[in-house]
Amino acid sequence: MDIKIPDNWLRDFLRSKAASNEVAKYLSLSGPSVEKVENSVYFIEVTTNRVDIASVLGVAREAAAILPQFGVKARLQPVKLPLLRFSGDVSYLEAQVNHALCPRFSAVLIKNVQIKESPEWLKARLTAVGVRPINNIVDISNYVMHELGQPVHTFDYDKIKGAKMVLRESKKKEKLTTLDGKTHSLPGGDIVIEDGAGRLIDLAGIMGGENSAVDEGTKNVLLFVQTYNPQN
């Protein structure tokens, strides 16, 4: 897997005076192979056994650990997140989850959102890592995934029929049209989510369904964060 990490984004978490070429050199000695640094962006090859570094924070953590081994001062800037309190009302969604496939399933309803263009700094960072900016809601979820390494997906809540989500394995030849407009005939055994009408709305861990996408008419967003069993 190849990822791109802008140096200015990395410095949000990596406190070091090391030049980008030093960071690249010593990182390559510890696991992630930095193929090149171009326009202050690291092009990194991540092996399948080191997906923990497939994010800005992951690379910063690795650099903070390896640079001092070569006499270069570096430390990891702790992640500070605000404590958010929710209403505790979960009646907005009925969720049926196969926990053998997905040990942890979290969903939060955010009402009365305003869909608009993201600020320039956010669009610039997404563009630098190869992600096309779409709108503020979709861009935020992509930003979190690239910064922290936690996949996040947003659904248009009002498009989820029956306010119900069932996470299960797909059946052979079930079909789903994903966000890129492509229709897939599934081989069976994929992790999918269906809504209360039995429609597939997400190919879990891969791409969301076109039929539940956030667009300019979205008013209520379901923020969806999940942890899958790696064996699946």
Residue ranges and their predicted role:
Residues 1-232:
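RNA/tRNA-interacting regions in translation and RNA-turnover enzymes
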